[in-house]
Design a protein with these regions (language model features):
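Class I S-adenosyl-L-methionine-dependent methyltransferase catalytic core
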Residues: 1-168
């Protein structure tokens, strides 16, 4: 993948393999990997789930898939084209899109910037849609700058993060 417009950073296969068990998948779950890249998360998914994928650099845009999925598991690029065609932060775009389509959960790899992306108004949207951050797994990836986290959001279970809706 020579084009790095979207700030593509390949997920180490071992990391994907070690993170998948944190996701409470059950037999028959429909799972999409919307930013497949070279397939680290997709290939690490257990055989008992139904898998689908998208990859913008292979002309299979995640927004062109219309099915609903139980789980979304991915390492999104740092930026994607927004509705105006300008490159923008992809983490909120991922959550905004899939919190209306995923039935059980969303798990994604992101850096510390993802916390800044969760503004009070965006946290309110997640709460209105019934989503909670249920787990954050800290990851050390030496070849990447900064600290990385595997965020797991679910409709079921209890969240560990809350917000103050007022800006001070």
């Amino acid at each position: 993948m020579a084009d790095n417009t979207y700030l593509f950073h390949q997920t180490p296969k071992e990391l994907a393999r070690d993170l998948i068990p944190f996701v409470p998948l059950v037999e028959g779950d429909r799972v999409i990997e919307p930013f497949k890249g070279e397939g680290a998360f997709y290939d690490a998914l257990p055989a008992f789930v139904q898998k689908d994928w998208a990859e913008i650099q292979q002309d299979r845009d995640y927004q062109s898939l219309t099915a609903d999925y139980d789980w979304v598991i991915t390492n999104p690029p740092f930026r994607l084209p927004n509705s105006k065609g300008k490159l923008a932060n992809s983490f909120w775009m991922l959550l905004e899109y899939y919190t209306t389509r995923a039935k059980k959960g969303i798990a994604f790899l992101g850096n510390d910037y993802c916390f800044s992306t969760l503004t009070p108004s965006r946290q309110a949207i997640l709460k209105e849609r019934g989503w909670k951050i249920t787990k954050v797994v800290v990851c050390a990836v030496k070849k990447w700058r900064g600290r990385y986290f595997f965020f797991i959001l679910q409709k079921e279970g209890s969240g560990f993060m809350d917000y103050l809706p007022t800006n001070y």
